[in-house]
Amino acid sequence: MSITAEEKTRLMKEFATKEGDTGSPEVQVAILTSRINTLTEHFKTHKKDNHGRRGLLKMVAQRRKLLDYLKGKEEARYQDLIKKLGIRR
């Protein structure tokens, strides 16, 4: 259900703002988005997994907070990130 270490490392390299960056909002949102997408697929077959659904909702809320922070801080970085991840239509 979770993402692998290799996938997490790939996301860190792809969305890092500088070398060795692991905690920027872009990296955190990318990792959360990957985990959310994985869980969304899980819930298509396990509809009654309400404990897992609670975790999913917490992840979505955390991603929303990070995106709001980034939007208030630097709108251009926010727009670039949502375009790369394809999370807004």
From Swiss-Prot:
Protein's recorded name: Small ribosomal subunit protein uS15
Purpose: One of the primary rRNA binding proteins, it binds directly to 16S rRNA where it helps nucleate assembly of the platform of the 30S subunit by binding and bridging several RNA helices of the 16S rRNA. Forms an intersubunit bridge (bridge B4) with the 23S rRNA of the 50S subunit in the ribosome.
Family: Belongs to the universal ribosomal protein uS15 family.
PANTHER family hit by this protein: RIBOSOMAL PROTEIN S15, BACTERIAL AND ORGANELLAR (PTHR23321), SMALL RIBOSOMAL SUBUNIT PROTEIN US15M (PTHR23321:SF26)
Database matches in HAMAP family: Ribosomal_uS15_B (MF_01343_B)
Gene Ontology MF term list: rRNA binding; structural constituent of ribosome
Superkingdom to which the source organism belongs: Bacteria
Keywords associated with the record: Ribonucleoprotein, Ribosomal protein, RNA-binding, rRNA-binding
Record's subunit section: Part of the 30S ribosomal subunit. Forms a bridge to the 50S subunit in the 70S ribosome, contacting the 23S rRNA.
Gene transcribed to yield this protein: rpsO
Keyword Chloroplast applies: no
PROSITE patterns found in the cross-reference section: RIBOSOMAL_S15
GO CC field: cytosolic small ribosomal subunit
GO biological process: translation
Pfam families, per the entry: Ribosomal_S15
NCBIfam families reported in the protein's UniProt record: S15_bact
